Amino acid sequence: MYVLGLQGSPRAKGNTNFLLDAFLGECQSRGAAIEKIQARRLHVEPCTGCGTCEKKGYCIFTDDDMARRMYFLLWRADVVILASPVYFYNFPAPIKAVIDRSQALWSRKYKLGLEDPGRPWRQGFMLSVGATKGKNLFDGMSLTARYFFDAAGAAYTDAVTYRRIEAAGELEKQPGVFDDVKTALEKAAPLFSRKKILFACRENACRSQMAAGFARQRAGDRIEALHAGSTPADRVNPQMQEAMAEKGIDMAYRSTRTIADAVAESTPDLIVTMGCGEQCPYIPGVSYIDWDLPDPAGRSAEFMRQVRDEIEQRVRQLVSDYA
């Protein structure tokens, strides 16, 4: 379970940061891995409205923090938290730049017809504070957040907002903040109790990525689908991405990782190996299954499709048996 917090306030340790820390802390106490991103520290080129992402599926900017990191984190996340103070009834510039650049993800879904496998289950929360008490104080932010979450492939699950909060440290004196956080997070509670299945192959570039993608798309509400490799490649296999795109599944912005890193972050209930069983660590209480599947890397596109289809069938049966 991975929760991504986006801290949109220019203040490093203000009320927004306190509220986000409370939310992330509650997620961590329930077993999630958490990460907080300070938007003010990111280098994000502003969207120019060029339309390239609508034609090609990728932004023209390839060397800033959105391209190198943020797209990957957004699609890795099970829960995305968008936290920010109100600036002129909307978001401050640093986090607004991140929101605007999510248009590239929107384009992949609504222009190219590809769906990130986490989209059906990913949850989004907005956290905000404002200095005034106007009835419509958060309306602009709420609408922006709703469309940002849709672009990033998340449902707009809930919002936690506070009026008449301005001075640093003021929210800490507000009664009931931690109760409000817990109440909101209950709407995502089923995600914290899913069974964890780790799919592992040698390079974490083809087979394990496809298996995790199919499992997440099919049963992400019941299964936390993890993936890793014994000797991970530097990046996922582009031919695998093309084969999955033929099924309408978007495998862009995927990273590889070691088996050791995966199990250190979250102990799986089941490990499914595909050619790397001898290198998987023994973990007491964890079940193991080995799928004898050939490595399609370096083979023909048709062979990649055959392995993809076999993995899809096995995942379908695994979900039926296990979840």
Question: Model segments located where?
Answer:
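Residue-level recognition of beta-strand->loop/alpha-helix junctions
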Residues: 7, 38, 160-161, 229, ...
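A short, gly/pro- and small-residue-rich
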Residues: 94-108, 146, 262-264, 270, ...
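Short, glycine-/small-residue-rich phosphate/pyrophosphate-handling segment
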Residues: 94, 110-155
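Short, structured active-site "lid" loops
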Residues: 51-76, 240-280
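Glycine-rich phosphate/pyrophosphate-binding loop and the adjoining helix
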Residues: 136-194
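Phosphate-binding/catalytic loops
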Residues: 127-134, 277-323
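Conserved active-site segments centered on acidic
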Residues: 192-261
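N-terminal beta1-alpha1-beta2 submodule of the flavodoxin-like/Rossmannoid cofactor-binding fold
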Residues: 1-107, 111, 175-195, 210, ...
